[in-house]
């Protein structure tokens, strides 16, 4: 099975401008993401950006770069433009790996592509990992996902879902029981789906939560979630996250 990885990267991040180029262990963060994608065994890895600074840095460490519009509201929109520009076929599998996920395991990238290949009835495959810390559950920067019994996504939110009506009032003594999952910012989809996604209007929930994947659920699409077997540390959204990732390396 062949798949390609596109890494959407922008400089003007709302919460942490310039984070794609922040130094982590002697390399820009985007390079760590790129190297994980290369190790996954992808047929091709491309960085899609609208910023000349990111392009220059990426080309300096040997990456293929596709320049895109600065008008995109999400990584999926940026990837859709890049896939067309690169001439990818509708049935090809693309993994969208966010540029702020420097600790993503390469095997998780491949597993996601394989999962989509095995499920013809879904629009998208994505990744989640069990939440084991109470602070992470209540962290608004952490996106949570609720699954059904077959691991299809029911809803995504920055809020701590599902809400424990009888237990969440006592956070200090809260014991998590394995029913909460953090969404990891990586998706697999076929190129042909991207055109369909762009034809859909953004839904109210997507606008409220600022989560692009809610558009898929709103319009009746199915997202199959792979529960990661190896640890997937959170991505980078804050200065504290940068220090955490630096300590990891």
From Swiss-Prot:
Pathway named in the protein's UniProt entry: Nucleotide-sugar biosynthesis; CMP-3-deoxy-D-manno-octulosonate biosynthesis; CMP-3-deoxy-D-manno-octulosonate from 3-deoxy-D-manno-octulosonate and CTP: step 1/1; Bacterial outer membrane biogenesis; lipopolysaccharide biosynthesis
Main location per the UniProt record: cytoplasm
Keyword Cytoplasm found: yes
GO molecular-function terms, A-Z: 3-deoxy-manno-octulosonate cytidylyltransferase activity
Subcellular location: Cytoplasm
Top EC class for this record: transferase
Catalysed reactions listed for this entry: 3-deoxy-alpha-D-manno-oct-2-ulosonate + CTP = CMP-3-deoxy-beta-D-manno-octulosonate + diphosphate
Tree of life domain: Bacteria
Pfam families: CTP_transf_3 (PF02348)
Example of a GO cellular component annotation carried by this entry: cytosol
Keywords, in A-Z order: Cytoplasm, Lipopolysaccharide biosynthesis, Nucleotidyltransferase, Transferase
One of the GO biological process terms: CMP-keto-3-deoxy-D-manno-octulosonic acid biosynthetic process
EC number assigned by the record: 2.7.7.38
Task of the protein: Activates KDO (a required 8-carbon sugar) for incorporation into bacterial lipopolysaccharide in Gram-negative bacteria.
Family: Belongs to the KdsB family.
Protein name: 3-deoxy-manno-octulosonate cytidylyltransferase
Species: Coxiella burnetii (strain CbuK_Q154) (Coxiella burnetii (strain Q154))
């Amino acid at each position: 099975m062949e798949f390609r990885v596109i890494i959407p990267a922008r400089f003007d991040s709302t919460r942490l401008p310039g984070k794609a180029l922040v130094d982590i262990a002697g390399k820009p963060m985007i390079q760590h993401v790129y190297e994980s994608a290369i190790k996954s065994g992808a047929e091709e890895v491309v960085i899609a950006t609208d910023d000349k600074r990111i392009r220059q840095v990426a080309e300096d460490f040997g990456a293929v770069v596709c320049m895109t519009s600065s008008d995109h509201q999400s990584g999926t929109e940026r990837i859709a433009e890049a896939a067309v520009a690169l001439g990818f076929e509708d049935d090809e599998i693309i993994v969208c790996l966010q540029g702020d996920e420097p600790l993503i395991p390469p095997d998780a990238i491949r597993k996601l592509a394989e999962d989509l290949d095995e499920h013809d009835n879904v629009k998208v495959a994505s990744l989640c990992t069990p939440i084991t810390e109470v602070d992470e559950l209540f962290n608004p920067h952490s996106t949570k996902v609720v699954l059904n019994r077959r691991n299809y996504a029911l809803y995504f939110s920055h809020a701590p879902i599902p809400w424990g009506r009888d237990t969440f009032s006592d956070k200090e003594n809260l014991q998590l029981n394995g029913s909460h999952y953090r969404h990891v910012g990586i998706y697999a989809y076929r190129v042909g789906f991207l055109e369909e996604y762009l034809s859909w209007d953004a839904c109210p929930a997507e606008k409220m939560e600022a989560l692009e994947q809610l558009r898929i659920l709103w319009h009746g699409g199915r997202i199959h979630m792979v529960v990661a077997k190896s640890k997937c540390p959170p991505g980078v959204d804050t200065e504290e996250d940068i220090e955490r990732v630096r300590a990891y390396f």
